[in-house]
Amino acid sequence: MIVLDASAAVELLGDTQAGKKIAARLSTERVLHAPHLLDLEVASAFRSHSALGAVDAERIAQALALHRKLPIMRHPHYPYLDRIWALRHNFTAYDACYLALAEALGATLLTRDKALASARLQRGNVEVI
C-alpha cells in the first residue's frame, strides 16, 4: 500500500526522470492513498513552476488532467490532527499529514523529500525515490 506525497506526484505528473522511476515503482499498485492536501500541494507546485516560466500553461493543464485520473483514494486529515501535532518538532504540518496517514494505514510513504526519510513511523515506512 502506497501513500503518495506531493513531491512524488509532481515528478510523476511532470514526466521527469524521477517521475519515470516513480511510475515504475507504482506500476503494480491498483490504488494509491493520499490526504486531501495532495491536490492543493500539487496545484501550488505547478503554480510555482508556471510563475517561474519553467512549465507552460498547456503542459500544466495536461498534468492536472492526468492528476485527476490517477487512482488515488483521498483521506481527510482531520482524524490525524493529534499525530500531526505530535510530529511538529521535526516536520511541518503538511509533511506530518502524509506521515500520519502512512502510519495509520501501515503503508509506505513514497516521496522525493529526503528530510522525510528520518521519520520513524509506528507502522509503515518512508521510501525516498
Task: Describe each model-derived feature in a short phrase.
Residues 1, 99-129:
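Acidic, PIN/NYN-like endoribonuclease modules and their adjacent C-terminal/linker elements
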Residues 1-38, 49-61, 114:
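Short, well-structured N-terminal submotif of metal-dependent ribonuclease cores
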Residues 4-5, 32-36, 90-93, 113, ...:
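Histidine- and aromatic-rich ligand-binding microenvironments
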Residues 11-13, 45, 119-120:
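Residues that scaffold the ATP/ADP-binding catalytic core of kinase and kinase-like folds
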Residues 21, 41, 83, 118-119:
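Phosphate- and divalent-cation-binding pockets in alpha/beta enzyme and binding domains
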Residues 28-32, 49-52, 67-70, 87, ...:
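Alpha-helix C-capping/helix-to-loop hinge sites
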Residues 43-72, 83:
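Active-site-proximal, substrate-binding regions of enzyme catalytic domains
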Residues 70-112:
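Active-site neighborhoods of divalent-metal-dependent phosphate/nucleic-acid chemistry enzymes
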